[in-house]
């Protein structure tokens, strides 16, 4: 991220366009997020973007903000200041985002799925990577270690397998549950072998997405 972009973000207060469906930054079909110099401009814009609102104005911390937007799956930040419109392209240099396991593709598809309900974003999840919580029993008399996949039980005692898009989401759940699990990277094909016919919850402590057997089979369906 160059000095021009740093100044653009840090020298003014901005409000961010928020999706009412996710309570997170709104991501459009071109994978842009939007920030505004004035509430007047923001309120005019939301008339053209359904189910959106705006955050309070704040001075953004450029590195943190860009990292966060990268993790959500944004490819550009559109900065609107009156009649002027600037675009900051994401991803930026690795040093700016401190890429860990942000998984922007999966987050992007989930945000767009929640915002639009369009099943193409559901099918896109087939190519994405997730974190699955596991416990590993150390070998004793057995030749191989045993892997146990953590599950959640909701009402009616039904079993749900768990997936997370980021280490932050995984750690939040792991600490809340006191599970002391480890994260295992899986894709939807591997997860289908793990879950058998049970449903899956993605990111249960934030904007959770529940996928039943029908939706999971739709994800894996060949084109």
Give, region by region, the residue ranges found by the protein language model.
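An interfacial alpha-helical scaffold signature
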Residues: 1-223
